[in-house]
Amino acid sequence: MERSFTVECPPFEVEISHWDRILPPTHSKRILCFSLPETTDKEKVVEQLHIAFHHTVQRLPLLAGSVVPFSSHQGGRPWLRNIIPEGGAQLIVKDLSEELRFSDLAKTNFSQHLLNTEQLCPLPEVGYFKNESVDVCRFQANFIEGGLLLVVSIIHNAADGRGVTEVIKIFANELSKAQSGETHYPLEPRPDVYRTDRTKLVSGHGVPGSIENHAAWTSDPANAHAQIHNVENSCRTFRISVKALSDLKKSLSATSRGPDEWFSTNDAISAFIWRSIMLARHRAGILNGDAETYVAQPVDCRPHLEIPMPYFGNVIYMTKSSVPLSDLADFESGLGAAARALRADIKGVTAEKFRDLVGYAERTALETHTRLNILEAMSTSGIILTSLFKMDLHGMNFGPIFGDGHIKALRLPARGTQAGAVIVLPRVPDGSCEFMVTEQESTIKCLLEDEYFSRFTNDADSIGASSEEVVAPLPQPPITSEEGMISIDSTPPVIEAITIKSAPDIEPVTIEAATTEVEPITIKSISDTETVTIGITTTEVGPASTEATSPVVEPSTMESDLVEPVTVGTTNSEVESVTTETTASKVQALTTISKEWHLVPAGDVKMPSTLISNRIDAPQVGTIKIIQLNRPAAKNALSVQMVHELSCEIEEIHNERHMGGTRALVIASAVDGVFCAGADLKERKDMSLTETQAFLTSLRGLYSRLAALPIPTIACVSGHALGGGLELALCCHLRVFASNAVAALPETRLAIIPGAGGTYRLPNIVGMSNALDMILTGRGVPASEAAKMGLCNRLVGADGSEDTQAFSNRVLALETGIQLAEQISDAGPIAIRAAIRALSYSCEAVENAAYESVLTTKDRKAALAAFSEKRKPILVGE
């Protein structure tokens, strides 16, 4: 009986929110388990399902759309997606009566081990991450002996957990209408265009936001979507009966610190699961006794934002609570410690907090992915706990074909979940609680052997293991206070009752990853040893020229002494040639060079082994940070260590929380004749494929974070900037080239392509034609030609002998970059950041929001007053 019905996409104009866009293209898969009488007319049921599905799509045409990645003109970021009115919604029908019996499922309480994802689900993959469209929604009706398994698959970009529940509610209503004859064939399309703008209800409203305000979230680089993977044979559903749930609430209430402290039913369930899983992981040898444990929980912000119902889109805020394992292990207070942490974080969620996070995600949308930071800890110290407990799916009436009209169970398929994912299912009609745990087998075994856990889950109503799941007791490591293990007391105490109040609803979200940081060592500044006098030629570079380009330096002849003349012909600017001798104070402040270290000796100096990092005072307020690449033996090639150390420097700026910190960043070379030679191929040749992929992930993450900095960034390029070295410069807002600079993306000559942003950042700067020329030929572009095509914003050249020219060009490029940073930093700190934000989006809405953010600043008032008084304003970033 296998067949498929397609409902063509009705016309719609839907503007999804940014909060919808950033979710990975994974589908929520809910398996609704119905019983059917043996005499059921399946053909009649199929007709009614088809009619109901058709009318559900007409009411919400978005369900028949397609999810597509952002196009190149929208920024082409892999973490952003749109929903377009193309394609259709599918209802697939299968008859599996010879393979599955409802009675067998009921005996195991609908165990996930009997529910084959590939067989039952219309979109079985964990996620659809390729650059192609994927359906928003598919339903699959699976007839089994004595029942029907209806699978609802809706992509997360279209609806969050409550949104999916609302869709199911609409379908239940339409199915009842079809059975009563209120709706029937022929099926008519929707006559009008469905229009909605979710951004009016869910947005940051121009709030810039700060990621530091949100413990569960990060924008640290990582290919989080790639870490979502299948986990099989480690998924199990448990039940807490009504009596056991009452006992559990009493156990938690006994830990209350007074009448002003109360816990919800959800707090009791969540704390119990959190504590039990972490102790089981400890017994399984996965988690050390001194570990900090974490749980992330999604909170539905519809009530906080006062959003009218139904609203289908994503309005989820994720909290992150932490408690040391040693505290969880305390039998008398562990449950209370967990619940107390959960309650505090849930109470801390407000409309303002949600908008702050969304505002940050909107502001940084094209440069970095705002995501959850718990993914990497999911198999060790963290879990994500999603509660559907108050979503009344069991109360929905799907019509008389199912007897009483109600589902007998709701299940989620095991495939597509990962260790650390916990789902609390909707409250069962008898008042009991079911929850699904996905863990490593060793953890599941330890859970089953935990007397305290079994006390609440192993009564007559609880779910027993199927025959293939029955396991022998696991040999447990000694539980002592030594070597990271902790002592766990499993003797239950005597408990008294206290009334428990209810909890806010909680919704599911998608899972992302995190990275760690290492602080570089700080050392004292190095004394100056020698000064040099430099003759300079400076060129302000205007718009890209349409004139013929200069002769090309091919990679085979890329020597540091082969450069084009400094003079540049452009259509809109003239070359200004200035040759001067710097004054003693200028040399002391900017160009005094240590022969050994090649430092600009101002401010504190940090020297990780591959970098030289220091600061100088910025005009008005704050400092200018200067980072010099310093691997002379490897021509500043990007090693694993250099990428890590540079990431730490960039994150240090991201973590600053005040305007008086870093005002601008200058990146230069401490090595004559080269800016950066690209990836360290000597190091690369000894890497495995996994190590190479990990390095590329780190490099791409570094470049995304550099490009996402809210302050001006300037690359000072002297000598060769090849491959990843040029891509590093492309991440900066501005580029200063010395006359000996040679830029190239030669990867095609190595049978690869640029892989760290070159293919999309370069055309945004020099245009598609020039980018194609550079990438397809792999040729080296000299400084003068680079200036003509707009690759650099300043072109400078040094006079002097051939022996000193490479050194002089490097120093001059750095000096010019610092002067440019000082010139920018003389303006208002808030205004500079707002301008960068507006330019990053290049749209009216963001510009308007950015302008609003500067209207009420003290700096604006100070600037207006200074203008009236004909003096220079003092702008401090307030």
From Swiss-Prot:
<comment type="function">
    <text>Enoyl-CoA isomerase/hydratase; part of the cla gene cluster that produces clavatol and ortho-quinone methide. The clavatol biosynthesis cluster cla and the terrestric acid cluster tra are both involved in the production of peniphenones and penilactones. The non-reducing PKS claF is responsible for the formation of clavatol from successive condensations of 3 malonyl-CoA units, presumably with a simple acetyl-CoA starter unit, and 2 methylation steps.</text>
</comment>
<feature type="binding site">
    <location>
        <begin position="677"/>
        <end position="681"/>
    </location>
    <ligand>
        <name>substrate</name>
    </ligand>
</feature>
<dbReference type="InterPro" id="IPR029045">
    <property type="entry name" value="ClpP/crotonase-like_dom_sf"/>
</dbReference>
<dbReference type="GO" id="GO:0006635">
    <property type="term" value="P:fatty acid beta-oxidation"/>
</dbReference>
<feature type="region of interest" description="Disordered">
    <location>
        <begin position="541"/>
        <end position="561"/>
    </location>
</feature>
<dbReference type="GO" id="GO:0005739">
    <property type="term" value="C:mitochondrion"/>
</dbReference>
<comment type="pathway">
    <text>Secondary metabolite biosynthesis.</text>
</comment>
<dbReference type="Pfam" id="PF02458">
    <property type="entry name" value="Transferase"/>
</dbReference>
<dbReference type="GO" id="GO:0016829">
    <property type="term" value="F:lyase activity"/>
</dbReference>
<comment type="similarity">
    <text>Belongs to the enoyl-CoA hydratase/isomerase family.</text>
</comment>
<dbReference type="InterPro" id="IPR001753">
    <property type="entry name" value="Enoyl-CoA_hydra/iso"/>
</dbReference>
<dbReference type="GO" id="GO:0016853">
    <property type="term" value="F:isomerase activity"/>
</dbReference>
<keyword id="KW-0456">Lyase</keyword>
<feature type="binding site">
    <location>
        <position position="724"/>
    </location>
    <ligand>
        <name>substrate</name>
    </ligand>
</feature>
<protein>
    <recommendedName>
        <fullName>Enoyl-CoA isomerase/hydratase claC</fullName>
        <ecNumber>4.2.1.-</ecNumber>
    </recommendedName>
</protein>
<dbReference type="Pfam" id="PF00378">
    <property type="entry name" value="ECH_1"/>
</dbReference>
<dbReference type="InterPro" id="IPR014748">
    <property type="entry name" value="Enoyl-CoA_hydra_C"/>
</dbReference>
<dbReference type="InterPro" id="IPR023213">
    <property type="entry name" value="CAT-like_dom_sf"/>
</dbReference>
<feature type="site" description="Important for catalytic activity">
    <location>
        <position position="747"/>
    </location>
</feature>
<dbReference type="InterPro" id="IPR018376">
    <property type="entry name" value="Enoyl-CoA_hyd/isom_CS"/>
</dbReference>
<keyword id="KW-0413">Isomerase</keyword>
